[in-house]
Amino acid sequence: MTRKDAKSSALVLFSGGQDSATCLAWALDRYETVETLGFDYGQRHRVELECREGFRSAVARTFPEWGERLGDDHMIDLSVLGSISETAMTREIEIHAASNGLPNTFVPGRNLMFMTIAAAIAYRRGLRVLVGGMCETDFSGYPDCRDDTMKALQVALNLGMDSRFVLETPLMWIDKADTWRLAHELGGDELVELIRVETHTCYLGERAELHAWGFGCGECPACRLRKRGYEAYLSGEQVTEPA
């Protein structure tokens, strides 16, 4: 791929979860070539990584035009992040609020590292657009999901690599119900069903039971949010966070 193709190509941070799967569909609907990037950082719910190829294959099979646009997949070993993170995302510990008010599922520096590595790969591959599922509506207070963080990171990456990357975050200002709605707008019931069955959200990595909203334990914060979002999507309502 040459630099002149960069404006019509994108690299999507694709974990295998609902949000990043929706972002992948969003990118496939807009760009001529879309590559994907995943990270193994020792996450407790690494079953999500096992969902990545299944979802990619299902999307390509179900939506042939998107399949023609779907490019290479990249998987990066980022185990160093897990080794320095004492969080409920990387350790078998109970999920609770930490002393700083953030949930202990927050992995410090995760999205900063993800985007920096994504930019390095995009630079080498001649890709201009980086797409991530960060969201400031359903973000549990994670500071590296904020719009200000992404805007600052875009500036830093462009200065540091003398490039003109564009960081796209299509979910930034929408809730989980609207994320389901966006999936429906992009690919109808077929895409919604693929996301429901083929993606993974549960922090505990539970994939034994298929609920109406997808697989999961049904009790962790991620499952509860996904469940409320799906139910609100079906009813046409917005998701309201509990007090």
UniProtKB/Swiss-Prot annotation:
ATP binds at residues 14-24. InterPro entries: QueC (IPR018317), Rossmann-like_a/b/a_fold (IPR014729). Zn(2+) binds at residues 202, 217, 220, 223. Its cofactor is Zn(2+). Keywords: ATP-binding, Ligase, Metal-binding, Nucleotide-binding, Queuosine biosynthesis, Zinc. The keyword Magnesium does not apply. Binds 1 zinc ion per subunit. The keyword ATP-binding applies. Its EC number is 6.3.4.20. GO terms for biological process: queuosine biosynthetic process. GO terms for molecular function: ATP binding; ligase activity, forming carbon-nitrogen bonds; zinc ion binding. It catalyses: 7-carboxy-7-deazaguanine + NH4(+) + ATP = 7-cyano-7-deazaguanine + ADP + phosphate + H2O + H(+). Pathway: Purine metabolism; 7-cyano-7-deazaguanine biosynthesis. Gene3D superfamilies: HUPs. Belongs to the QueC family. HAMAP family: QueC. Catalyzes the ATP-dependent conversion of 7-carboxy-7-deazaguanine (CDG) to 7-cyano-7-deazaguanine (preQ(0)). This is 7-cyano-7-deazaguanine synthase. It comes from Paraburkholderia phymatum (strain DSM 17167 / CIP 108236 / LMG 21445 / STM815). The gene is queC.
